[in-house]
Amino acid sequence: SLFELGKMILQETGKNPAKSYGAYGCNCGVLGRGKPKDATDRCCYVHKCCYKKLTGCNPKKDRYSYSWKDKTIVCGENNPCLKELCECDKAVAICLRENLGTYNKKYRYHLKPFCKKADDC
């Protein structure tokens, strides 16, 4: 769910997920999809593509369990869809951390109508 995703992003990046990524670029946040503006936005684009591959669960609502061991996210689910959902969220949180160096505040509240159409996943 959005709750676990937000928690993972906070743990990996140290940033407030809603404030820092809720409307970042063309792909971060609930709305929008478009050609990524930078590496951070690309993380969100790949994350949305990951969600598209899921079948049998709702990425925004379904809860899953994970643990934080030695600063590492460990997904712990028996349900295959919830396990994949957790892995999608883990991947974006790590990607956002790996691209903190190029995070650009000018894209924090980017207007989605200015986004160009993205390639298909």
From Swiss-Prot:
One of its GO terms (molecular function) is calcium ion binding. It comes from Bothrops pirajai (Piraja's lancehead). GO terms for cellular component: extracellular region. Snake venom phospholipase A2 (PLA2) homolog that lacks enzymatic activity. Shows myotoxic activity and edema-inducing activities in vivo. A model of myotoxic mechanism has been proposed: an apo Lys49-PLA2 is activated by the entrance of a hydrophobic molecule (e.g. fatty acid) at the hydrophobic channel of the protein leading to a reorientation of a monomer. InterPro entries: PLipase_A2, PLipase_A2_Asp_AS, PLipase_A2_dom, PLipase_A2_dom_sf, PLipase_A2_His_AS. Disulfide bonds join 26-115, 28-44, 43-95, 49-121, 50-88, 57-81, 75-86. Residues 105-117 are annotated as: Important for membrane-damaging activities in eukaryotes and bacteria. It comes from the Eukaryota. It is found in: Secreted. Belongs to the phospholipase A2 family. Group II subfamily. K49 sub-subfamily. CDD domains: PLA2c. Pfam families: Phospholip_A2_1. This is Basic phospholipase A2 homolog piratoxin-2. Homodimer; non-covalently linked. GO terms for biological process: arachidonate secretion; lipid catabolic process; negative regulation of T cell proliferation; phospholipid metabolic process. SUPFAM superfamilies: Phospholipase A2, PLA2. Its main location: secreted. Coiled coil: none annotated. Keywords: Disulfide bond, Myotoxin, Secreted, Toxin. Expressed by the venom gland.
